[in-house]
Amino acid sequence: MCGIVGYIGQLDAKEILLKGLEKLEYRGYDSAGIAVANEQGIHVFKEKGRIADLREVVDANIEAKAGIGHTRWATHGEPSYLNAHPHQSALGRFTLVHNGVIENYVQLKQEYLQDVELKSDTDTEVVVQVIEQFVNGGLDTEEAFRKTLTLLKGSYAIALFDNENRETIFVAKNKSPLLVGLGDTFNVVASDAMAMLQVTNEYVELMDKEMVIVTDDQVVIKNLDGDVISRASYIAELDASDIEKGTYPHYMLKETDEQPVVMRKIIQTYQDENGKLSVPGDIAAAVAEADRIYIIGCGTSYHAGLVGKQYIEMWANVPVEVHVASEFSYNMPLLSKKPLFIFLSQSGETADSRAVLVQVKALGHKALTITNVPGSTLSREADYTLLLHAGPEIAVASTKAYTAQIAVLAVLASVAADKNGIDIGFDLVKELGIAANAMEALCDQKDEMEMIAREYLTVSRNAFFIGRGLDYFVCVEGALKLKEISYIQAEGFAGGELKHGTIALIEQGTPVFALATQEHVNLSIRGNVKEVAARGANTCIISLKGLDDADDRFVLPEVNPALAPLVSVVPLQLIAYYAALHRGCDVDKPRNLAKSVTVE
């Protein structure tokens, strides 16, 4: 949510900022702005809406070698020009952008800003006004910045300009992602490496409660006591081409097509020299020796965790609970004596999950993060990390990260089973390869998925997905995909729960999608389909080859039933994509949603 870019060097700052903000659009935003500095002063441009709207108001002729930019997701104050960042202090000396939530901004306003008239409804403006008050009281900019930071409660990533020192950007971070990018004659800061790939792939990670003084030839990291901190940089594996759509009309379609490649990369990455699936020994031992595992996730990651629970329990014989991160923080269950916590997060920055991680680490429990982003907050703060190796996922609606999470959880469960002396009964490497081939075949059947979307969803107001066992867990993910990008009210249900209330919602023409990939519940789910069809539902059965019936709408390639979620979700992703497309929705950037939810 939100995004920051800052640049200071020899190039055209405004264009670097605008291009950087475009690379952060996937994070979600409702307004955007930049501030650039030159000999004449600091010039602010901002606008409600898209980056394209911001470009329209930026002075194309202005020349500047330094600047800060921001995409805003409204948390305090409605989306508007006045609430958009950057914000300036009352006397105009300071200009600031901020991601996060300042929890005590009301108290700060009451204590320090009684005589200052605020122009916006944001917590951010309070921060820049307090900094100016401290400077007016005799502190220099660095001292005022540091003093203000010590007062802030909540999360923040901040970039600050001083109109009397326009060759420096002051930066700070706490519980909100921020990186510094290094160059020969410039330096850059951003919420995400993808915003900086246009100029550099060398980065320095910032830790919580650190501030940075950035010039075109120097980066000085300090803690909030003013002590200088030395930290090595690293070279990111990302390439600028990794975040381009290429010939695809949308990132979501590209990322759906990349799933077979990701599967094969996971197979390759998690094999040892003998071709046997492997994870670091301490991780395998932690899973095998835990008396209970708690999987923590949000949204799609939570849904992947539901599938992973089945693998760990069925194969490794370790009991598992799956929890929504935002609920766990406030309703922690009774914990076992030797738990292991597994955190699922594509970005590794999910605020709700991090809140749980902080809690369980304080209790002394071990934690494993499964993420797509090395060096992310959840990765750094957990005891162990497994990477998804899925490559950048730009579309807000997750596709390849979901299947990658399931695959990595399957690998983890298999390795833990082996460590516990349990034979899972089949060659997982071989079966994952077969699943990858099946996913590839499904990605080649887009015309059929588009036809189903047209037939069932073009004018529908709602839709239901039903399944049993593993299929039920895929149904809730399929429903989420449809609702978040097409705005159709969609819900996933366990087939057996229909008669306990949901069937009252079925009326003539209601679309009902049913998954049938598990033999032991095949007849039961087909019975549920007959129940809703008898009440007027427009039913669509998607079945696994070998369990199919003549009336099924679509038959999936044959795979090991345990891995069917990897395959059955692909048609649901594509159906959701085409439904959104035909309804005129913004597939990659659906309304009100953010890719990386970095505030609680």
Curated annotation (Swiss-Prot):
Its main location: cytoplasm. It is found in: Cytoplasm. Residues 2-217 form the Glutamine amidotransferase type-2 domain. GO terms for biological process: carbohydrate metabolic process; fructose 6-phosphate metabolic process; protein N-linked glycosylation; UDP-N-acetylglucosamine metabolic process. It comes from the Bacteria. GO terms for molecular function: carbohydrate derivative binding; glutamine-fructose-6-phosphate transaminase (isomerizing) activity. Its EC number is 2.6.1.16. Coiled coil: none annotated. The active site is at residues 2, 595. It is an enzyme of class 2 (transferase). One of its GO terms (cellular component) is cytosol. The keyword Transferase applies. Keywords: Aminotransferase, Cytoplasm, Glutamine amidotransferase, Repeat, Transferase. InterPro entries: GATase_2_dom, GFAT, GFAT_N, GlmS/AgaS_SIS, GlmS/FrlB_SIS, Ntn_hydrolases_N, SIS_dom, SIS_dom_sf. It catalyses: D-fructose 6-phosphate + L-glutamine = D-glucosamine 6-phosphate + L-glutamate. It holds the Pfam family SIS. The keyword Transmembrane does not apply. PANTHER family: GLUCOSAMINE--FRUCTOSE-6-PHOSPHATE AMINOTRANSFERASE, ISOMERIZING, GLUTAMINE--FRUCTOSE-6-PHOSPHATE TRANSAMINASE (ISOMERIZING). Homodimer. Catalyzes the first step in hexosamine metabolism, converting fructose-6P into glucosamine-6P using glutamine as a nitrogen source. This is Glutamine--fructose-6-phosphate aminotransferase [isomerizing]. It comes from Bacillus spizizenii (strain ATCC 23059 / NRRL B-14472 / W23) (Bacillus subtilis subsp. spizizenii). The gene is glmS.
